[in-house]
Amino acid sequence: MNSNFNQHFERIKELRALLNKANYSYYVLDSPEIDDAVYDQLYRELIEIENIHPSLITDDSPSQRLGGVPSKGFKNVEHNIPLLSLDNAFNLNELESWYGRISKLISSENKNIKKVDDLELICELKIDGNAISLRYENGILTRAATRGDGKTGEDITTNIRTISTIPLRLLLENPPSWVEIRGEAFMPNNIFNKLNIERKNTDQPLFANPRNSCAGTLRQLDPKIVASRKLDFFAYSLYFPENWEPTDNNFKKPISQSESLEFLKNIGFKVNTTYETTKTLNEANKYYKYWEVKKDFLAYATDGIVVKIDKFDIQNLLGATNKAPRWAIAVKYPAEEKATKLRKIIFQVGRSGAVTPVAEFESIELAGTSVNRATLHNAKRLASLDLHYEDTIIVRKAGEIIPEVIRVIKEFRKVDAKLVQLPQNCPECNSKLILESNEAITKCINYGCEAKLKGLLRHWVSKGSMNIDGLGEKIINQLVNEGYVKSIADLYKLEIDSLLELERFGEKSANNLLIEINESKNKNWHKQLYGLGIPHIGEANAKSLSNNFNSIEELNAIAKESPEKISNIYGFGNEMKDSIVKWFDDSNNQTLIKELKAIGFSLKESLDSNYNSNQSNVFDGKSFVLTGTLDSLTRDEAKELIESAGGKVSSSISKKTDFLVSGEKAGSKLNKAQELGVKIINENELKLLL
């Protein structure tokens, strides 16, 4: 019996290796090594042995591609390395602008690069699919996740195993302890067309496009359905431990994106071989124009190209923003356009009083979605279109996301059609509108305009500011319409009896909302500042202001006495400076500041957000990881504290981690930190260090 088991053990290893190699040759190299009959015979033998000895079934067995029992749902998993998006360019001029910016940045940081021509670029097709992160441990696929928000995605490992072009085991001797692969899952055009024919024949709604179809397939709870739809995958990047070196002489550690693609192909992945390397922007432009014509002949959907700095050392020099790497940009192809009939124009009033015309038209399909409205932006844009009621208009989706009216077909215009004009009075409060001389924006300047107030309140309770989840748009509208709230400060004067008079409020929900509103007074200074809704001041700008000015009083004084100090802040300019000065000049805003301070807002830097301004770089060069639930800080707040003191917060533990900040219900990171000898501290110890 033992002898028989040992024979089966050795044979099953041999079968797995033969079948995995055959899959790689067939699906990735498109060069079958064995005929189908031999493959079927080997596969049948594998299944027979696994049925006899279930303990010999491994994650990298070809039998596991078919998937198991249907899942009950998808759990969220944290990306060890953030899965960032790319910044977009919508024409070659914007590509040139990006190229110029990074060239200057690189030249200033690296004196060995003296001119633009020294930059090596790589151009790749932008596959119109779904970004996927794959994690391999000791060479075996252990997890696959969707992009999600870039930090956290959904675990779809079972479904990803069904994709034949994704290896279950890397073709690499002595692989590193972990490898992360990034790539694009997609549905080939012929599979998409076949699927829609089947759905039409069975009276099911059709999928709008291959991307949506792929996304829906990956979220199927039954992996057998996923397997039947024959998704495909292109790998485009990989990450591994810095100290790892290949032991196989046939492999060289990649030092560029182009070498990385070759490496990926050699370890078992399918890569898109249409990429090209170049040293000139002109050649990148030619690549873009070539595939703009040829893309419709491809077997898969592509919506543009991606241009990257090829060398990893230059990529590292450029780094990334919170959302995207600086060393890459996606250049989108022109959007799809369609004609439709204009039905009406509505005029929306924002929190700053800006009146925005919005076109409503007969519904059309653009880039796979139904569209029936689009913003016309401002008076200048409206005038340039020469838009008349019931015009036939051309609508496109910019970047396949935002619909826009690009022109009018005047030949179809009725003789008696009326010109669309901005109203002279606010559509909400009937106050006189003004067109500010330095802007193309028509505004309502009535501080008491309810539409402005509702917009400001929505901004104040948003995630980037007070983050009051219980105050949605419908509740805000009720509070304003009933006269309970006439300013931000009035939110903090609400009583339970007033809330109970509103729709869908019981005593418990009313109490919970009042508690949440009251707790928001403790938010950090930069969140309070952002919530005030100063025009042109976004969340990142508010944070920069809070880093330079410790209180609303200091910022107020600077705005009046030395406004140039504002425009001198990195990333600021005269427009932002003027907006801040104008905001503080408004007596209504001065009244709001007094009201907020009277009800308990500090409107200044607190000890929790700046323990010692003289030690702002106390964590310089130190690496932190957060785990569990902290006592008084959210993870984002703890991260802000650490980064403001010069530290770096990572999502995964390694030997290079200096501190693990641990809270309640700490997970596996705590165990790993103990194994690696990483110093473990709690929230109070973090505050003491600060």
UniProtKB/Swiss-Prot annotation:
One of its GO terms (molecular function) is metal ion binding. The active site is at K126 (n6-amp-lysine intermediate). GO terms for cellular component: cytosol. InterPro entries: BRCT_dom, BRCT_dom_sf, DisA/LigA_HHH, DNA_ligase, DNA_ligase_CS, DNAligase_adenylation, DNAligase_N, NA-bd_OB-fold. Its EC number is 6.5.1.2. Zn(2+) binds at C426, C429, C444, C449. It catalyses: NAD(+) + (deoxyribonucleotide)n-3'-hydroxyl + 5'-phospho-(deoxyribonucleotide)m = (deoxyribonucleotide)n+m + AMP + beta-nicotinamide D-nucleotide. Its cofactor is Mg(2+); Mn(2+). It is an enzyme of class 6 (ligase). PROSITE patterns: BRCT (PS50172), DNA_LIGASE_N2 (PS01056). It comes from the Bacteria. Keywords: DNA damage, DNA repair, DNA replication, Ligase, Magnesium, Manganese, Metal-binding, NAD, Zinc. The keyword Hydrolase does not apply. GO terms for biological process: DNA repair; DNA replication. NAD(+) binds at D36, A37, V38, Y39, D40, S85, L86, E124, R147, E184, K308, K332. Residues 614-690 form the BRCT domain. Belongs to the NAD-dependent DNA ligase family. LigA subfamily. DNA ligase that catalyzes the formation of phosphodiester linkages between 5'-phosphoryl and 3'-hydroxyl groups in double-stranded DNA using NAD as a coenzyme and as the energy source for the reaction. It is essential for DNA replication and repair of damaged DNA. This is DNA ligase. It comes from Prochlorococcus marinus (strain NATL1A).
